[in-house]
Amino acid sequence: MRILITGAASFLGRHLVEYFLSKEEEVLALVRENARGRDELLKYEANNKFKLIVLDMKDIERLDIDFDVCIHLAWGGIGKEGRMDENIQRENIDAAIRLMRVCKERGAKRFLFAGSQAEYGQTLSDIESKYGNDFDINTIPKQSEDFPTKPKSEYGKAKLELKSKLKNLGDSLGIEYVHMRIFSVFGSGDHETSLISTCIKNFKENKDVHIGECIQSWNYIYINDLCEAVYLLSKKDLQGEFVFNVAGENNRILMDYVKDIKRLLDSSGDIVVEKKEAASEGLPFLNPNIEHLKRIGFVESYGFEKGIKDCI
C-alpha cells in the first residue's frame, strides 16, 4: 500500500511516516519548502519505500504520482490568532477539497482527514453552567461521534464543515472518507511549550511548574497509540462508519496528569497554580467516547504513564 501523508514534517506527520515505514508500507511524505521539521525526514531517504515530496498545498494539482490512501494533516493557522482567522481557515477548506479531487486522479481509494476535538466546542464554562462548579466528570455524558457540535473557533468550524463536504465529495468520486476527530496527542517531538513538554522539562530539573487551575476534563493519547489508530483506520473495514474519535481510553481531570508527571520524575519542583487568561474559544472540556475506534480493533498499548516514561 502506498500512503500519501500531507503535513509530513509536523509532529504527527513525522511519527506517522516512521510508523507506516515500520509496517513496510510505501510512504510519500509531502512537505512545503520551509516546513519546520522537514530535515528530520531526511534520515528516511535511504529507504526505498520512502519519497519526500516538496510541494505547497496551493500547488497540489502538480502532484504526479499515484497512491492508495491519503492522510491529510497539512493545515494553516493553528496558532492562537490563526485559529480565529476565517480567511485562513477558508483557504484550508479549499485546499482539502482540491486535494480530494487530486486523490481521485491519482487512484486513491481512501482519504483520512485530521479533524479535531475543537469541532465539539464543549468548554469548562459550559459544564459549570449546566452542572455547577463541583461537577463529577464520571456523571457527565461522554462525547460520542454523534454528540452535539458547537465549535467556538473558526478552526473548529472549518474542520466540522469539511466533515460533510469531504464525505459528500468522496461519495461522488468513489473515495471512502474517514473523519478523524483527534484529541490531545503527546510524545517526543511535540511543541516545547505544550503542557506535557513544560512539565517534563521543569520537573526533570526540579523546577516549579506554573500552570492554570487545570480543573477541566482532559484526554491524552500517546503518539504511538495514535499512529496505531490511524494505521487501523487506513486498513480496516470500517463497517459503514466514517467519523471516529481518536483519543485515549481514559478521561481525567487535567491536574491529575500534571501530578502524575511530577510523581514519575520524583521531582521536588512544585505545582504553582496561577490565574491564566483563557483562550478566546474558552477552555476545552474533553471527555470522548472511543467505542467506534475500539470496534475496529484499537487497543491503547501505551497509555499515559507508559507514554510519559518513554518521553523521559
Features from the language model and the residues they span:
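Conserved Rossmann-fold NAD(P)-dependent oxidoreductase catalytic core, especially the SDR/UDP-sugar
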Residues: 72, 97-154
